[in-house]
Amino acid sequence: MKQAAYLQINKNDNVVVCLRAMHVGEEIKTSHGIIHVLRETPAGHKILLHDTNQNEPIIKYGYPIGHAKEPLKAGEWVNEKNIKTNLSGTLEYEYQPRIMPLEIEHEDRYFKGFLRRNGEVGIRNEIWIVPTVGCVNGIAERLARQLEKETQLKGIDGIRAWHHNYGCSQLGDDHENTRKVLRDICQHPNTGGVLVISLGCENNQPEDFMKLLGDYDTERIRLLITQQVEGDEVEAGMNILRKLYHKAAQDQREEVSVNKLRIGLKCGGSDGFSGITANPLVGAFSDWLIAQGGTTVLTEVPEMFGAETILMNRCLTPQLFQKTVKMINDFKTYFLEHGEPVGENPSPGNKAGGISTLEDKALGCTQKGGHAPVCGVLSYGERIEVNGLNLLSAPGNDLVAATALAASGCQMVLFTTGRGTPFGTFVPTMKISTNSKLYKTKPNWIDFNAGELVEGTEMQTLRNKFIDKILAVANGEKVQNEVNGYQEIAIFKNGVTL
């Protein structure tokens, strides 16, 4: 099957997206006749369908993605040089609910996971070492390597020390955010045993931190305060870790329904194909999982700017709508208070890949949330309380946002990318390429190829293949970031460092 040269995403769009590089003089058929390409235009970029005056809107996905900086001719390459964002400051919004039922059949699908005492299910069974403060990162890493050498990982999936720079010299929200995220990591179902390791004199006082965990299982979570150890703190830590290991190594996978899955949705290194391949594929999966009773979480609040009303009007209640409005405007205020414009998000890589404005990026980004109603809105560091589609307050930064998704309780993060990235957070971070070229050139980074969608594969066919892949990972198949050992955490910081 011959691949199409371009795609008009919505019938109301005044641009098409090039599915391959297009050359001067090539024809594009429109409802008003044939136009000719005026400039060499790379794949993923936009070509204008009709003459447009200065300040007139550029329409993509059926919505404005900005306005023309100057008069533009039909056939012109539309990019960041001739289009400008419409975004500015905070806005007032009106709740106009547009909630559509998901007409997706229920399927009896299962995976084998680790059932935890609180009813949550893990897809990994790892030993984690969680520093309360960055001062003990080195000890934590040494303990992890020593336990790995001693046990050879028999009966468990991994041993990880989650390094970070915080836990001291922080005040206010930064201090609380650090404590919340570290608490969430300790309570995550993907771990079968946690050693909380403290220095002892830090702002994040160990005894107070342990109180945040509530009624925790003392056979699964233990504390070591290194300043209180007389002698070798490494040996003291190993004595605790051996007990945690022997407990976790007894855990066995059990068959559970897919409604136990909580999946984070993230994109990074996006390009012009993100909104027509990988993000819609993830959105189709999200709708399917929610129809089965499962949960997905969408974040990257600054990358919702320009598409936020779509999500707001999918909120189930006026209260959820108001929480979403606050989430959006709080992030805009955060930008403005730091002297940053709200619409200058697209990175050099985004622009090179065909994304020209933040609206362009946002309308593609939010497609990862499919069409399901918004059932929950979470603050940073807050854990999932209701099944269905949740929105989470966190920035667009890949490491910070992915960590926040995992901290909310997601057992896995689906990460779409057009440019490619190797990183992963503290849960399996599955990379989905927007184009086949990336999938072929970076097989050591990428786990699944959504580029097939512009090469003749039907969405339903690829979605089903994608579901099978996700369930295989839930059953224990490693994704590339796990194979490579690229796993880390990053915590959101807003204020001063003492």
Question: What name fits each language-model region?
Answer:
Residues 2-412, 419-422, 427-498:
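Metallocofactor- and cofactor-centric catalytic cores in central/energy metabolism, strongly enriched
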